């Protein structure tokens, strides 16, 4: 198990990652931006507080999300790099999508041009088709769960409600 280290200046480090500002909040904790202490690479860190994962359904949900994130490898699906565990939390170290939510992108622009919307749709279809080939159903696709990278490419995130299935 890793340790949480709080420096004199107030910065928190877990494993090889320095925790930064909050990016969002979820059922079991929050998502923060992080920086790898050796490489300087920016990452998203989903902090899951173990004391909020109370019943069997919660444990199953978190385990299923982690299992799914471990097997998916597609340019449109956010990548899980590693998991750091402490006594009180699980830290899911993931790919950081700097562009934020597709929802905010659309709201800020008030509209999306047809060519750009088609690009988003094709990327989304590519990601969903890949997930379905693996027998994974996301079950919570919405603009808030579609993030964007530096080049405005879609990244599917938040597999908390996802499940696996066998065709037939």
Where is each model-derived feature located?
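Activation segment signature within eukaryotic-like protein kinase domains
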Residues: 120-121
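Conserved N-lobe beta3->alphaC-helix segment of eukaryotic protein kinase catalytic domains
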Residues: 42, 47-72
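Activation-segment/catalytic-loop signature of the eukaryotic protein kinase fold
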Residues: 83
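Protein kinase catalytic-loop region centered on the HRD/HxD motif
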Residues: 124-136
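Conserved short submotifs of the Hanks-type protein kinase catalytic core
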Residues: 88-101, 105
């Amino acid at each position: 198990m890793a340790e949480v280290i709080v420096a004199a200046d107030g910065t928190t480090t877990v494993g090889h990652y320095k925790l930064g500002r909050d990016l969002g909040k979820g059922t079991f904790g929050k998502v923060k931006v992080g920086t790898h202490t050796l490489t300087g690479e920016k990452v998203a860190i989903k902090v899951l507080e173990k004391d909020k994962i109370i019943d069997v359904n919660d444990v199953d949900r978190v385990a299923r999300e982690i299992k799914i994130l471990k097997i998916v490898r597609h340019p449109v699906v956010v990548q899980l790099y590693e998991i750091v565990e402490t006594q009180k939390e699980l830290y899911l170290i993931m790919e950081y999508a700097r562009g934020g939510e597709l929802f905010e992108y659309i709201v800020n622009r008030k509209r999306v041009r047809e060519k750009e919307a088609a690009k988003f749709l094709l990327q989304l279809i590519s990601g969903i088709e890949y997930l379905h080939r693996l027998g994974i159903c996301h079950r919570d696709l919405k603009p808030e769960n579609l993030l964007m990278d530096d080049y405005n490419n879609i990244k599917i995130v938040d597999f908390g409600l996802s499940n696996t299935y066998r065709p037939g």
